[in-house]
Amino acid sequence: MSNKLVDICVNLTDDVFAGKEKNIIDAANKNNVAKMVLVGNDLDSSLKVSSLAEQFSFVATAGYHPHNAKDWNEKSYDSLLSILKKNHVKAVGECGLDFNRNFSTPEIQNSVFLNHIDLAKETNLPLFIHERDAFHQMHSIIKDNVIDCDKIVVHCFTGTKNALIDYLDLGVHIGLTGWICDDRRGKHLRDFINIIPDDKLFIETDSPYLSPYISSKKPEVTSAMKHLNKPEYLVEVAKD
């Protein structure tokens, strides 16, 4: 594979990568991954990825993951706005709705997500969205509140064919991860990936999560998580 790859979701501030950032990036470069989007999931990580993006000439996002929506306070909007004005920060997020485990209540998630939409409108930046087990609510919010759906990425899509069609009808972009490599959980994605237009499709690792379970390179086993995913494995997602 000669074309250089871009990993649109790397959680480089995760504890399992601490102190290894340059090694992770170097290994990715050797495996044809030229650029990364470093994702913020709360205020602290958003600050860190903005600095890392500047250091390594990548781009970053700033936002509150729905799991962390409960940590939103009266200062969060202005604090994020300040980060979003930095040169290397190019999207609002990771933000959205996750009703799978509800680490934050659905009501709080909805409210905080609407704040992120307001931030995207104020800064004219794209939205980087996380949605799990919340398709109907997410679709409704996007349809009612977002003006330019072409500036939305629904990352780590693992839903149904009907959900995918409805998202594409809105005009959003879709991100696919290593789930597509795994017959145990992602086989259904390969059955309808061809309906995603080339100009609406992104690939990502969402590392260190969602290992593609590749046979040629066994992911490193750590005490923190059973399978440590890395940006260097993006090539496996691209192959599938």
Model features per residue range: what roles?
Residues 1-240:
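Mid-domain alpha/beta scaffold segments of enzyme catalytic cores
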